[in-house]
A protein has these predicted regions:
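Conserved ABC ATPase signature
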Residues: 38-42
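Hydrophobic anchor residue at the start of the ABC signature
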Residues: 52
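Conserved catalytic motifs of ABC-family nucleotide-binding domains
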Residues: 59
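Catalytic Walker B motif of ABC-type/P-loop ATPase nucleotide-binding domains
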Residues: 63-66
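H-loop/switch region of ABC-family ATPase nucleotide-binding domains
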Residues: 98-99
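A short, surface-exposed alpha-helical micro-motif characterized by mixed small hydrophobic
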Residues: 104-106
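Conserved ABC ATPase "signature" C-loop
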Residues: 116-117
Length: 179
């Protein structure tokens, strides 16, 4: 079962079966998985979530992810990224390869742009997306909120510079318009 598979990671680290099952259930519930389901009967996205759960349950200090949201539906993507964000918020260093710029915008704290095996840029999200030459060279398409922020700055809303989170952008506009 999914519960057995996820709990096995904790058992390997020396936890009792009860402790392992308790920890596994916490992660399984966050990912909205059926603990009694057979891993062999799951969709690709669900199998991906089980693999992540088996890793996350061990509370790693470093987590390396390669396209963790690839092929997932919107809700699966949100669940996975929420679990990853919780890990990061509790001190885990997360290194993620990702080509989905919306995911990058919502979850990354730093962006390293690699093109043809070479690092083009290493910096904040706003720094990278505001640098047109880097975006052009790496064929990066800035997410819509980046384009909106940059357009607002060009049209006199200087306080919108570098604001790529929806709430931050809305709040800056409210202040600028005295709302």
């Amino acid at each position: 079962t999914i519960l057995e598979e996820v709990a096995f990671s904790c058992i390997l680290l020396g936890e009792s079966v009860k402790e392992a099952n308790d920890h596994a259930m916490q992660v399984i519930e966050k990912l909205n998985l059926d603990p009694n389901a057979s891993p062999f009967m799951l969709s690709r996205g669900q199998r991906q979530m089980v693999a992540l759960a088996a890793t996350v349950v061990t509370k790693p200090k470093i987590l390396v992810l390669d396209e963790p949201t690839c092929g997932l539906d919107y809700m699966e993507c949100l669940r996975i990224m929420q679990v990853v964000e919780d890990l990061r918020d509790h001190g885990c260093c997360v290194i993620m390869v990702c080509h989905d710029m919306e995911v990058v915008l919502d979850f990354a704290t730093r962006l390293i742009v690699v093109n043809d095996g070479h690092i083009l840029e290493d910096g904040s999200i706003s720094h990278v997306f505001e640098n047109k030459s880097i975006c052009d060279e790496a064929a990066l398409c800035a997410p819509l909120l980046c384009a909106v922020s940059q357009g607002l700055v060009k049209n006199g809303f200087a306080k919108c510079k570098g604001l790529y989170k929806r709430d931050m952008l809305v709040n800056a506009l409210k202040k600028s318009c005295n709302l």
